[in-house]
Amino acid sequence: MSIINMTDLDLAGKRVLIRQDLNVPVKGGKVTSDARIKASLGTLKHALEAGAKVMVMSHLGRPTEGEYDSAFSLQPVVDYLNDVLECSVSLASDYLNGVDVKAGELVVLENVRFNVGEKKDDEALSKQYAALCDVYVMDAFGTAHRAQASTHGAGKFAPVACAGPLLAGELEALGKALHNPARPMLAIVGGSKVSTKLTVLESLSNKVDQLIVGGGIANTFIAATGNNVGKSLYEADLIPEANRLLAAAKDAGGNIPVPVDVVTGKEFSEQAQATLKAVSDVADDDMIFDIGPQTATELAELIKNAGTIVWNGPVGVFEFDQFGEGTKAIAMAIAQSNAFSIAGGGDTLAAVDKYGIEDKISYISTGGGAFLEFLEGKALPAVTMLEARGA
């Protein structure tokens, strides 16, 4: 990859515009989960300590483009940064014609999605962003799969475009896992729908030595093997695809393990009674909400022997404790493994957090959609742009 790294540049006295992913949950004007901001702090501190005039841009939520809405303002992020950084941090809401920023100061530019043309990668808006800086830094892996004015267009027209440490680290970790993995390589793909992750399953099935499916995705595979799934979430129209993937894995000398025991409930609620059953005993009015202990033990053994682990998606409804034992067992097996492990996706990160294994995962990806598209082998527009600018 011919990408320029921000850390290799002399930033002293330069106007540096950093696109970060500060799209954090806010309630009552306060940031309620600061993981993304914390992940971004290293980049900000490096630029500030290098003597740069630092501007940061990000989106927050999904406001109506072209309209200011205080509910989507980055002011709570500015308040947070003022508490944790030792420099002046201010918010600029009218910035397209220029920003007054001094060396060692930080100016946060108001939500880019308030600007008309942001989502469409508008060329005129991109050029306005680019004119604000001497150096454009793309550091938001979570939005690298979107070709938008702040993530893509601005970098095309800026005098210099480079990758920030967060983005560079993410690409390096994912590249290590996918392009030169320690074997055996194992991928866990969970979540609710096969349809949204079918291309991921297909792409990974050609790369990994062992594919594990969980959640609603596993229900479709259970149905494909001729078992009743009752009222469980599954996709009947994708049973042929599941059978094709099962057959392909077998032809390659491997297999996709289908749960042998499951935990069921009669309703989707925190109060639902959990019942352990053999997969062949699921009743018509049952809903499968987790894998059973025998399945969890078998999967944990596969995880224990892996050289590389990619984890995207829980294997059960872990938000409800009675249906969380399967995901907990998977999480603990990954934590105890000596493999190089990567976890990504919102629900996965919530599980990592719930079971307290953050420091046992080799790399935690900040991207959701971008993480999946990278796993699929798709080119990420922001990365392609940085490669072109670095050539």
Swiss-Prot record:
Q: Where is it predominantly found?
A: cytoplasm
* Residues engaged in binding substrate: D21, L22, N23, R36, H59, L60, G61, R62, R113, R146
The GO molecular function terms of this record are: ADP binding; ATP binding; phosphoglycerate kinase activity
Kindly indicate whether the keyword GTP-binding belongs to this entry: no
- What is this enzyme's catalytic activity, as reactions? (2R)-3-phosphoglycerate + ATP = (2R)-3-phospho-glyceroyl phosphate + ADP
Q: Which pathway or pathways does this protein act in?
A: Carbohydrate degradation; glycolysis; pyruvate from D-glyceraldehyde 3-phosphate: step 2/5
Q: Which GO terms describe its cellular component?
A: cytosol
PROSITE patterns, A to Z: PGLYCERATE_KINASE (PS00111)
UniProtKB keywords: ATP-binding, Cytoplasm, Glycolysis, Kinase, Nucleotide-binding, Transferase
Instruction: Locate the residues binding ATP.
Output: K197, E319, G345, G346, D347, T348
- The catalytic activity of this protein is classed by the Enzyme Commission as 2.7.2.3
Give compartment(s).
Cytoplasm
Q: Which GO terms describe its biological process?
A: gluconeogenesis; glycolytic process
Name of a matching Pfam family: PGK
- What family, per the record? Belongs to the phosphoglycerate kinase family.
Describe the subunit structure: Monomer.
The molecule here is called Phosphoglycerate kinase
